[in-house]
Amino acid sequence: MAESIEWVEKYRPQSLTDIVGNKKSVVDMREWAQSWLSGTPEKRAIILHGPAGVGKTSAAHALARDLDWETIELNASDQRTAGVIERVAGSASKMSSLTGTTAKRLIILDEADNIHGNADRGGARAIGGIIKNTDQPIVLIANDLYGLTPSVRSLCIELKFNSVQGRSMIPAMKRICVEEKIMCGVGVLEKLAESAGGDLRSAIKDLQAVATGRDEIHIEDIATSERDTKESIFKVLGKIFKSTDPKKALEATYGLDETPENLIHWIDENLPLQYGTEEGTQEDLITGYEYLAKADRYLGRVRKRQSYRLWRYAGALMTCGTVVSKTHVGRGFTKYQPPSFWRKMGQLRAKRDMRDNIASKIADHANKSMRYSRTDLAHLYGRMLEENEYAADVTFDLELSIDEMVYLTGKKKVTKDIQRIHDLAQAKRRSLGRDEGKAFFEKKPKKQTPDKKQMDLTQIINSTPQEDKVEKKETENVPPVKKSASKAKPQKTLFDF
């Protein structure tokens, strides 16, 4: 039995009522969408986050189908730079529906936590700007919530999609077997659901793979090999901090999709939250950091010598050392935090990117180098932004965003003056168009008879006293030329050949 289409696509949920599991998140999605029908809600975007294959993307498309909304989707296969996101999602968030009705357009940004690298430069920063100004609902889909910047998360409603339970997968797979006219026992479906590890999409793919060429499936037809699963970092941290067995804590890291370079930051951030919070446990905290320091030495040798065999010793020290350093196990719930080091590095990187982006605009505008624009001209343009006479023209000429204006002026947040100047520049851009605008230092010529002796400002700046003297001398020495009926044919030179 050959299939030209994957069952995952063929039986994709057409409505939110068809979504398997995560009923609470589905209800919250519907309530958020309903709030758009009565105006613009406070939170204009939602984040659907959770492991792969649990129905996040399907839920977003089903929501649009239930409300008869158009959809615009950007996923990992698309280039998602700041320009692309602003051109596609930004324009879509402002324009009306293609049908001309008042129906909304749902903007879906899949794998939003994977916007990084040179291919997607500036994309993460553009998302925040679009969410702030959008008139259309936006859905961000992510496997790792902390892969999104804190500024973006603060603008959104966070809805978690958990792994689908096996007993919820079985009815969905049974309906597929009925539609495909395949005889299949409940034991087979239970085995497929168990091996999927909460991933409904993988379970359906496994079912299709087993059913290919068969009309009946038996338990013997299912491969006994188990699917590779990845442990959540939060589960691993719980085993490290709550366990009393160093071996189990170390084995928990084997299925973790994190390097020792990253794991040590997680342990470093959450060690004070777990140890040292109660009286008499300060020694546990000190001992734990001593083991982390030893692990960090091995990581330093890895970076210096490129000897990745030393990772095993670093991993053992940071996990087993954390376990043996505690004198008693805390039983309360602890909310583990992502490393603040990453957040600070991300903020510094964002500032550097903004600085270089502004310097690039100034360099193009002033015809200077990036380095000179960054070190010498940036503060001058910042001063001009504080002058009412030039501020709107500078903003218009450089096409500055509000965040770039805040950075140039050295303010900590958007002020009323910055917002007013940005609005004036935007109004000028809409009325004139970018190509018709004049540079802020150029004045429009008056409608009068041109004077041969009068030079405009650009000529005055570019001319030198020596050139003026030479030009004047040549003008005095050249005799007047008599007008003739036909112009003399210019003499050819070697360069004409």
Curated annotation (Swiss-Prot):
ATP binds at residues 50-57. Keywords: ATP-binding, DNA replication, Nucleotide-binding. Residues 428-497 are annotated as: Disordered. This is Replication factor C large subunit. Signal peptide: none annotated. Pfam families: AAA. Part of the RFC clamp loader complex which loads the PCNA sliding clamp onto DNA. Heteromultimer composed of small subunits (RfcS) and large subunits (RfcL). GO terms for molecular function: ATP binding; ATP hydrolysis activity; DNA clamp loader activity. It comes from the Archaea. The lineage of its organism: Archaea, Methanobacteriati, Methanobacteriota, Stenosarchaea group, Methanomicrobia. SMART domains: AAA. Belongs to the activator 1 small subunits family. RfcL subfamily. One of its GO terms (biological process) is DNA replication. InterPro entries: AAA+_ATPase (IPR003593), ATPase_AAA_core (IPR003959), P-loop_NTPase (IPR027417), Rep_factor-C_lsu (IPR023935), RFC_lid (IPR047854). Residues 428-455, 466-476 have a biased composition (Basic and acidic residues). Residues 456-465 have a biased composition (Polar residues). It comes from Methanococcoides burtonii (strain DSM 6242 / NBRC 107633 / OCM 468 / ACE-M).
